[in-house]
Amino acid sequence: FTHIYDELVMQEELICGLAAPIITGNSCLGVLVVGHRKRTALTQANLDTLTLIANLLAVEITRDRAEESLQKSLEHLRTVFECTVNALSITAEKKDPYTAGHQRRVASLACAIAQEMKLPQYYIDNVRTASVLHDIGKLQIPTDILTKPGGLTEIERLLVKTHTQAGYEIVKTIPFAQAISTALLQHHERMDGSGYPQGLSGEEILLEARILAVADVVEAMASHRPYRPALGIESALEEIRQGAGIIYDAEVVEACLKVFSSKNFTF
C-alpha cells in the first residue's frame, strides 16, 4: 500500500493528506486516503467526514460478510434437511414395498399442480417435501396390514388412519418444517369435513395439504395396490373431477386436470 501511496503523492504533487482506516472487529480492511496540493486545504471537518465514510464502509462490509456467512449456513442446513427427508422417504418405502416410488410420484404431480397454480417457490418447495414424506407415519403400521391383499377390518382401518398424526409427530421436530408437518397431518382431510384426523373443512385445511390430497388420490388410483389392480389415470381424473368443490379443492382439481390435458404430465 505504501508504495502505491508514494507514487500517487509524487504523481499528483500532493503535499498534505488525511487517512481513515476501515476497521471491522480487530482487522483493518483498508484505508481511505485524501490528498491535496495545498498545505492548508484539509481541515478537521474533512477528517471527520472521511472517518464517517470509513466507518460506514466498515458497517457495510461487515453486513455483507455476515449475509454471506448466513447464506452459506442456510445452504448447509438445506442440504442436511434434504438428506434427512430422502433418508426418511427411503425408510418409509422399504416398509411398504407395494408403494415404492409412490411418494416421489405424488411429489412430481403435486409440484406440477402447484406450478400450474402459479404459487410462489416456497409453496412449491413445501409441497415437494410434504409429498415425499406424506406416508412417513406408516412406519408405525405393521407391514402385514399395509400389504394385506384383502379388505381391512375396522380396527385395521383405524390403525392405518393414525399414520397422519404419526407423520406429523415425526416431522414437527424438524426446524422450519411447520407447514410441512401440518400438510402431513391434514392430507386426508376433505373440503366437506368428511376427512380425518380432525374433520377440517374448506380453507381450514392448509393449501399444501389440499394439493397433496389431490395428487395422492390420483397417483393411488392410477397405481397397483395389494387389494386391487390399477384403475388408470382416466378413472383417477374422473374421481377428482366429480369431487371438485365437494371433497377436493376446486382450484387444485382444475390445475391437476390442466397438468394432464395441456402439459401432458406423466408419472
Question: PLM ranges: what are they?
Answer:
Residues 1-16, 36, 190-201:
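Signal-transducing coupling segments at domain and membrane junctions
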Residues 15-23:
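A short, aliphatic-rich beta-strand micro-motif
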Residues 22-25, 39:
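Sensor-regulatory modules in signal-transduction proteins
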Residues 28:
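Glycine-rich acetyl-CoA-binding "A-motif" of GNAT/NAT acetyltransferases
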Residues 31-41, 149:
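Short beta-strand-to-loop transition segments that serve as allosteric relay/switch motifs
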Residues 44, 73-76, 82-267:
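Metal-dependent catalytic cores of enzymes that make or break cyclic nucleotides
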Residues 51-58:
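Allosteric cytosolic regulatory segments
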Residues 57, 63-66, 70, 77, ...:
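Heptad-repeat alpha-helical coiled-coil signal-transmission segments
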